[in-house]
Amino acid sequence: MKNSLYILFLLIFNLTFSQVNFQGLIKDVNGNNITGANVIAIEKESKILDGFGISNDSGFFRLNLKKDLDYEIKISFIGFKEEVFDLKISENLEKDFILEEQAEALDEVEIVYEMPVTIKGDTIVYNADSFNTGSEKKLADVLKNLPGVEINEDGVVEVEGKEISKITVEGKDFFDGDSKLATQNLPAKAVGKIEVLRNFTEAGQLRNVTNNEDNIAINISLKSGKDKFWFGELLGGVGNDDRVLASPKVFYYAKDFSMSFLGNNNNIGEPVLSRRDFYRFGGGFNNLNARNGTSINISSDGAGLGNLQNNQAKSIDAQLGAFNFSKTWNNDIWEISGFAILAETNNIIEEKITRNFTSGLIENTEDYVVQDNKQQLYKFTTSFIPNDKLQVEYNLLVKSAENVENTDLTSNSFRDSSSNPVIQPIETDEINILIRDEPSSINQELKTYYTLNEDNIFSFEAQHLSQTEDPFYRAVRDIQPFRDIIPLDTDQSKFNINQNRLVDTDKLEAKLDYYYILTPKSNLNFTVGITDVKQNFNSNIFQILDDSSELNFNQDFLNNDVDFNFRDAYFSFNYRFITGMFTMEPGFTINTYKSENIQLGNIENNSFTDIRPDLRIFMKLKDSESLRFNYTATNQFTDVNNLAEGYIFNNYNSFFQGNPKLESAKFYNYNLNYQSINIFNFTNVFANFNYSKRSNTIQSQTLLSGISSVRSAINSTLPTESYFASGRVDKRFKNFKAGFNMNFNYSNFNNIINGSLAEQESFTQNYRASVATNFRDKPNIEIGYSYNKRSYDTGDFKNYFYTDSPFVKIDAYFGNGFVFTADYSYNYYRNESETLNEYRFLEADLSYNKEGSKWEFAIGVKNLLNDTSVNRDSFNQLYSQTRSYIIQPRYTVFKLKYDLTSIAGS
């Protein structure tokens, strides 16, 4: 690490004193400043783009150039004649320029392609080759080079601190805009331009009457120059310990038709589509009633299967097959598109977990988990846009899965005695757990936008969800659990306990919006809508005896048959107006609620009306700087899962009993957001603060006995608050970039444990700083450090965990075709008294692609230092937890890739 810092310091020192500044003002013939003019410097001998800049709102530009080197300077702006001249300087130079308008506008497409950055209204266009260093393999690598663009830990693209709404390719949806599929599968060589579309909306009629500051999309323009073309790659690999990789990717694009095929079969830990991604994948369906003041959480993934930690496990086998298409007719008036995704993952998870319970017991478990997850997603979309006044769209999304998880678990319980630790456990239980579910859903959506005239706009949207979940749970164990609840037959060799569940959900949402344009800077919005939910919940617990017969328990508290109905009819009004630098949008919503749940012969009815104000203030300090405030109040309702009165297994040592008398909770949220995106000097600043408070909270009431708990839900007037703050600064220089970010998350809440009130706090702090080189003709290195502190306070127990993580990343293009990349991180994980674990990650790849050749040869090594385990910690109202899980060992993979662009059509 010290050597890396020393090398980086020498590079910065050497380059700082071997460069000079070329700066000045750019104006038109009338003396007006020209904002957004491109200034580029090309080395005359090598023809390499060595520097570029953009004039700011004062017309000022600055370039850092090498001393005594011959450059060709080009200054251009759309609608003006280009200024081209040669330059060679040995000291700082300041010079102003006047651009003349030309009779005919320059070809905008040509300018966008040649210039590194072009700004057109809310759109920023980056020329990928101007930022690439030569080591890029996929779209994610290209995007990471761009200022203000990040790829987060989940593989989702963030621009200007916000998750993007979608990614399109040549204006066509790529798997409905899913950024993870696009960034991991589009070859970097095919990327020509990246268009960042700010204030994005798919309904053009609503652009000037709705708030879209949080909506950002990315469009990828491909390198081709042809009306019809194929591209893609075939990738294969083999390694030690029977490691294999096969990944074909084929793409076809034409003006009126496009299609893509993605395949992947690997056991080297490369993610394709995880079970978590499956539930996240919305297929482009938006939260229809996000602003109506009502939230009802329709639970999914009810089986409670485990998720991978950062795509790490002892073994990961993954398969993916995906097809995407789009077809248009009559100059894009009518379009149909869709996709099919089939994925399967087979994971082996081996982990050790230590839980410190508030009851004073410590539980150590050793888990061996085998997961088999199969997912299918199908999407069909058709849209009809005959003119700029009418837009109609229909969407259909079908999802299904088959998930099976087998766990062999050993649980040892100890009394907490730091001064005199107990060697022998007070209880040991061998448990085999089977969890299985086959969820499915059909989601339909209809959207219609109609502009009657310049003052009247109508919007109608409706969604219908039909969902079925059937989680099954089985635990075979040595020790009888929950003796006071389940009347098990004790004259058996083991206790074989089973539970069936079936949850059917039917949800309809619809709303009609009317926008009345008062002036070019103000409008009224009237909305009427409805949310209607119907659910049926069935469950039963039974025991399988040694002779394979079933012992069914007929007690009401061990079975469920619940019907739940919920309806919200609402009217909302918002007044949006612009005055000076402010965009104001006060409003209110009137909701009429009615809910009913029927179980055990009893009917629980609840109905009431609520008026909820909301306020949004947007302050535009500059074109690139803004401050935003949002206030919302939301009624939060639970679904049938929290209302069912019969007992439900959460896991082997936890029962849950619903409460049919639960009422809605009130959620108040205050958000303040600041951002400054300076495209002229590539400095970005983001800050966010969020405060939330709940009243009549739905919270836990728990009976804890040893390591076993029975939890129920109640409404409580006890305060529940949370604070979240984050900030990020990143700065890009000519050959360097630096960044710093931090976030704080504090929550204070109350629970009732064994009849006693327990006030609990959680406070998490994260800091990350990095500095990196950004050369086109030299190796690049990034050095950084992250620090994480987590504190958990349950009143009687306090736990503190710390993780220090320095990291180094290297990528180098050299030798006319060689690319070397390496990624190293060291993690020092500890609590206040001892080191809990130290682990490192080191991955390295070396590839060779001869210029002009379609073949690429590569060798990659995963987990080069052969570390064996990784730690994570977490906290809830009953215990704090430290988890250590086994990761894949070191292995080497030899790869061969063929570029399918060689079979491109005409």
Explain the meaning of each model-derived region.
Residues 42-48, 70-85:
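A short, solvent-exposed loop/turn motif at the edges and junctions
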Residues 497-585, 597-602, 618-622, 717-728, ...:
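Outer-membrane beta-barrel transmembrane domain signature of Gram-negative proteins
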Residues 366, 507-509, 553-559, 657, ...:
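Outer membrane beta-barrel strand-and-loop segments of large Gram-negative receptors
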